[in-house]
């Protein structure tokens, strides 16, 4: 087997890679005839950027004024709770902290593991229950466990509690689509990807897209 030829390699400066990536995304969306709503544009593009999957241009679903609501929550110091440590690691916590918010994941807590074992349920479900008791408004960023979204829905059905916002992008085959549809039929503000696709990286990308838009707007004032 011969050596790889380098003639098709595009040499890009490190600081230009992201800019070049978004230019490619813009060009491919135009080729496909896809025009994203202005409010949703940068969030969906960042999801495509993190996944290299243009299907998201068709399946990302936003409740009315979702982006404005989410950004206002962040500006007012809302916290973000994730269902995986991977999503937690991917969120830009420095930018979030600049608005007074914190990011949390309870999945590795001993208390959560014990409660889940006792109840014969998932740690993700217990994590959402604990997060619902936080005093501050919480943006729930679910990128892995449909049981987290099912738990959020069930808590809404059993009480007057409502989540401030739901980012629902769990990935997989079992109960994933049904769990997303549960939240879609509620009146809570949400950003959800219909279908089986999603993931912790997608959940983090959505959070970061919101954070970066707020940061950039603040810097341009």
Identify the role of each PLM range.
Residues 2-79:
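Electropositive, gly/pro-rich neighborhoods at or near active sites that engage anionic ligands
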Residues 14-22, 36-40, 44, 63, ...:
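Generic structural signal for well-ordered, non-membrane alpha-helical segments
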Residues 83, 167-168, 206:
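Buried hydrophobic positions in well-ordered alpha/beta secondary-structure cores of metabolic enzymes
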Residues 164, 174-221:
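C-terminal functional extensions of proteins
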Residues 20-28, 46, 69-73, 90, ...:
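Alpha-helical scaffold segments in soluble metabolic enzymes
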């Amino acid at each position: 087997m011969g050596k790889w030829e380098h003639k098709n390699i595009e040499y890009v400066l490190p600081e230009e890679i992201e800019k070049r990536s978004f230019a490619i995304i813009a060009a491919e969306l135009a080729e496909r005839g896809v025009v994203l709503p202005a409010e949703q544009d940068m969030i969906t593009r960042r999801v495509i950027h993190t996944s290299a999957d243009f299907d998201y241009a068709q399946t990302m679903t936003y409740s009315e004024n979702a982006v404005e609501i989410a950004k206002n929550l962040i500006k007012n110091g809302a916290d973000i709770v994730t269902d995986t440590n991977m999503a937690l690691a991917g969120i830009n916590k420095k930018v979030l902290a600049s608005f007074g918010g914190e990011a949390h994941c309870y999945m590795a807590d001993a208390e959560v593991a014990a409660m889940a074992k006792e109840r014969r349920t998932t740690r993700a479900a217990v994590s959402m229950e604990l997060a619902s008791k936080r005093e501050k408004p919480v943006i729930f960023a679910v990128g892995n466990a449909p049981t987290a979204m099912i738990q959020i829905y069930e808590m809404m059905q059993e009480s007057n509690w409502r989540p401030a916002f739901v980012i629902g992008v769990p990935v997989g085959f079992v109960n994933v689509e049904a769990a997303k549809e549960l939240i879609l039929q509620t009146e809570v503000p949400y950003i959800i990807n219909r279908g089986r696709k999603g993931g912790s990286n997608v959940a983090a990308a959505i959070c970061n897209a919101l954070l970066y838009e707020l940061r950039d707007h603040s810097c341009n004032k």
